[in-house]
């Protein structure tokens, strides 16, 4: 499945909620008609079956984190293999992706921008350049912006935007040196309450 390159608002409108795909300079409800689906008949949202609700939730989370279907299914298999709550573990795996951690630390305004920063070798993981967005960051790992990338205007803008976001207990960030430490595994209680991971588990469990 190819990566979607179309309008970001269209994806958020399809799911009926902000997927945080845009920078946040301006409220998404001002930029996107969030209360209507895209298309000619967007004003009328179809009533979904149980399967439809499960599928929409999976698509919403997959798009939110910018993960393709094959990779997302692998994350579910891994989460199901581990001990504990499968849904919470799935979100923990998604949150531990390097591109997401870069976004959470405020070095990028969106996850897509964070992914690009990683791919273009602008990020270091434990002192070594890492250009793999899906690399799993563990507790104690240090993520930093490479020296030659620190003066990029988009990174400076992202840092300013991040000041308006809620601080997370599981990461510690130094905005002067542009590096941060993942102190512990991501805490489900600090993640989006708009995600119903149980619907995703029910979908894949069939």
UniProtKB/Swiss-Prot annotation:
<dbReference type="Pfam" id="PF00163">
    <property type="entry name" value="Ribosomal_S4"/>
</dbReference>
<comment type="function">
    <text>With S5 and S12 plays an important role in translational accuracy.</text>
</comment>
<dbReference type="GO" id="GO:0003735">
    <property type="term" value="F:structural constituent of ribosome"/>
</dbReference>
<feature type="domain" description="S4 RNA-binding">
    <location>
        <begin position="96"/>
        <end position="156"/>
    </location>
</feature>
<keyword id="KW-0689">Ribosomal protein</keyword>
<comment type="function">
    <text>One of the primary rRNA binding proteins, it binds directly to 16S rRNA where it nucleates assembly of the body of the 30S subunit.</text>
</comment>
<comment type="subunit">
    <text>Part of the 30S ribosomal subunit. Contacts protein S5. The interaction surface between S4 and S5 is involved in control of translational fidelity.</text>
</comment>
<dbReference type="InterPro" id="IPR022801">
    <property type="entry name" value="Ribosomal_uS4"/>
</dbReference>
<dbReference type="GO" id="GO:0015935">
    <property type="term" value="C:small ribosomal subunit"/>
</dbReference>
<dbReference type="GO" id="GO:0042274">
    <property type="term" value="P:ribosomal small subunit biogenesis"/>
</dbReference>
<dbReference type="InterPro" id="IPR002942">
    <property type="entry name" value="S4_RNA-bd"/>
</dbReference>
<dbReference type="InterPro" id="IPR005709">
    <property type="entry name" value="Ribosomal_uS4_bac-type"/>
</dbReference>
<dbReference type="InterPro" id="IPR001912">
    <property type="entry name" value="Ribosomal_uS4_N"/>
</dbReference>
<protein>
    <recommendedName>
        <fullName>Small ribosomal subunit protein uS4</fullName>
    </recommendedName>
</protein>
<dbReference type="GO" id="GO:0019843">
    <property type="term" value="F:rRNA binding"/>
</dbReference>
<keyword id="KW-0694">RNA-binding</keyword>
<dbReference type="Pfam" id="PF01479">
    <property type="entry name" value="S4"/>
</dbReference>
<comment type="similarity">
    <text>Belongs to the universal ribosomal protein uS4 family.</text>
</comment>
<dbReference type="InterPro" id="IPR018079">
    <property type="entry name" value="Ribosomal_uS4_CS"/>
</dbReference>
<keyword id="KW-0687">Ribonucleoprotein</keyword>
<keyword id="KW-0699">rRNA-binding</keyword>
<dbReference type="GO" id="GO:0006412">
    <property type="term" value="P:translation"/>
</dbReference>
<dbReference type="InterPro" id="IPR036986">
    <property type="entry name" value="S4_RNA-bd_sf"/>
</dbReference>
